[in-house]
A protein has these predicted regions:
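A broad detector of short, well-ordered amphipathic alpha-helices
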Residues: 20-21, 60, 67, 74
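N-terminal short secondary-structure element
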Residues: 1-31, 36, 50, 56, ...
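A short LG(V/I)-centered, amphipathic sequence patch enriched
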Residues: 41-58, 63
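Interdomain hinge and pocket-entrance segments immediately C-terminal to HTH DNA-binding domains
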Residues: 54, 84-99
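Glycine-centered flexibility sites
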Residues: 17-20, 32, 45, 62, ...
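Short acidic/polar alpha-helix capping motifs at helix-coil junctions
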Residues: 47-48, 59, 74-77, 81, ...
Length: 99
């Protein structure tokens, strides 16, 4: 199943360009990250990554999933924010600079 977690794993992998560093940033093991990406590929029936000599690159399918995944995760965050605002709960962060 395409899950939020698997999409977040793909985004982290692309951001860090390395399975080990992405796994560390996600606080999961490298084998767990590998299994998550493989499960996403199996679910979609497409190879998302080119894995050559320790380097990774997105395939055309990977680029599409990355783009749509970002949109889905952003839409989910927006929905949560809007529902919280309607329910009277404030969420988010405010940065203030004083000079």
């Amino acid at each position: 199943m395409i899950t939020q977690r698997r999409l977040q794993h793909l985004l982290a992998l692309v951001e860090h360009a390395h399975f080990g560093r992405a796994a560390q940033a996600l606080n999961i093991s490298q084998p767990a990250l590998t299994k998550s990406i493989q499960a996403l590929e199996a679910e979609l029936g497409a190879t998302l990554l080119d894995r050559k000599r320790g380097a990774i690159a997105l395939t055309v399918f990977g680029e599409l999933v990355l783009q749509r995944g970002r949109s889905l995760l952003s839409a989910e965050a927006d929905l949560r924010r809007e529902v919280a605002l309607l329910a009277g709960h404030e969420i988010g962060s405010l940065k203030v600079a004083i000079s």
